[in-house]
Amino acid sequence: MGKRSLKEWIVRMLTLCVGLTIAHLGVTLFMLTNLGSDPFNVFVQGLNRLTPFSHGITHMCMCFLIILILLFVDRRYIKAGTLVCMLLGGPIIDGFTYLLGDLINESMYLPVRLLIVTAACLILAFGMTIVIQSDAGTGPNDLVAVAISEKLYKPFGMVRVIVDFSFVLIGVLLGGVFGVGTLFCAFLVGTAAGVFMPVSRQIVEWILEKTM
């Protein structure tokens, strides 16, 4: 691949931001139902109980810490999009929580909450694949498994399961919510992402074709 022009970088970064916003809408829906969230946000929920900050600020601080560690491990993992994910991920969650908090909460009927969790899985998976296909960088929390897998020469799938389990275990011990939403996320998001990946690739290619 040749060197990217400034215009292409801007388009890819904007595409990443759209995907990030979609993905974190899914994360917010998980949390508002109080039926459990994705592994990393179970961890963040637990940490958040120990701080006076919002969930979004705690999320941003943890992503910043991961980036600092990666700077010492191997800075090649960090791209411009990684920093964007760190800076915008938390505030996006806080923004959606403010907008939707009065509409979606744990007082809703369980079947409705389960439907919302299912929708959250699909929304998260679609947004995540847009971020990946933008090829502008990956979220810091996703880089944990990538870095460990490559540095220890272990299969990524196995490492990702161990990392996710560790996030959940530590999060629950700190007071994070583990529930059916976490299980839904574990089984549905990956499958849905596999379906969405070629669709998202076509979307990103179409955007680049129309804007270049």
Residue ranges of predicted features:
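Core subunits and conserved enzymes of cellular information-processing
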Residues: 1-212
